[in-house]
Amino acid sequence: MSHSVIVQSLVVKPVSLILLCLCLGSVAAALSGCVTEYSGGTQMSADPDATVEKRVSLARQYIGVGDWENAKRNLELAQQIDPNSAEVFEAFALVYQSTGENVLAEAQFQAALQVDPSLSRARNNYAAFLYSQGRFVEAEREFKRVTGDTLYSGRPMAFVNLGLSRLQLGEKKEAEAAFTRALSMDRRNSVALLEMGFLRLEAGDTGEAARYHSDYRATAPTQSPRGLLLGLEIARAAGDTDTLSSYELALRSLYPDSSEYRLWEERQNR
């Protein structure tokens, strides 16, 4: 079983999907276990736009703590004021995606982008949704559009997600270009560093792969299963049996139920 088979056998989730609420900013992180509500029905402010914004903000907080019913309640109140708010549609999409109602989620994402095609956060989340459904061609197309927005704060992560989509399509050269762009904007992006390590190793450049892995370890003191797998592959390619044994022990001890460990074990048994 070749290295490339191991790499391609693992579907790496796009970053925004891993975090789910990545594009909601730091809302969830700012919560301290409670959500501050407002009273007075929909009359939170004399300014309708401000009221919608507050309701959507509340909904995002509820999404951050997994309270889907209160999230939907606030979004419904916001929609009573502005039936065509892209922000409301997007937040509804995140709720439905989280509750496994994928048809509804997609409809809401599409509604958001129809109202405001320039809302890159919504497009990035929609692309992550498509990726989660295995619709990699569509995801790649949407992530590519997101990366074209030079003012989008999440652009470096969008390049990472673009690279991950291209990997799933077997477009390794194009994936490497996307990861390189991501690293030019954020040199400490652990996902891009890790995937570049795999790509360089597969290209036969063990030294560069080791450099990327070293940079990855500097950003991730506790390595992920995929990080340990890269360490294993580099050690194997370099003939470093001591390091290989060390990484194998770490992968077996820390992540015995991981896909990476199962794949490594299958490889050793062939």
Question: Predicted segment positions?
Answer:
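Register position in tetratricopeptide repeats
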Residues: 64, 98-99, 132-133, 149, ...
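Structural marker of alpha-solenoid helical repeat scaffolds
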Residues: 47, 81, 115, 149-151, ...
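Bacterial Sec signal peptide processing site at the extreme N-terminus
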Residues: 28-51
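Canonical tetratricopeptide repeat
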Residues: 91-94, 125, 159-161, 195, ...
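Terminal, low-structured helical/coil segments at or just beyond the last alpha-helical repeat
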Residues: 38-43, 218-270
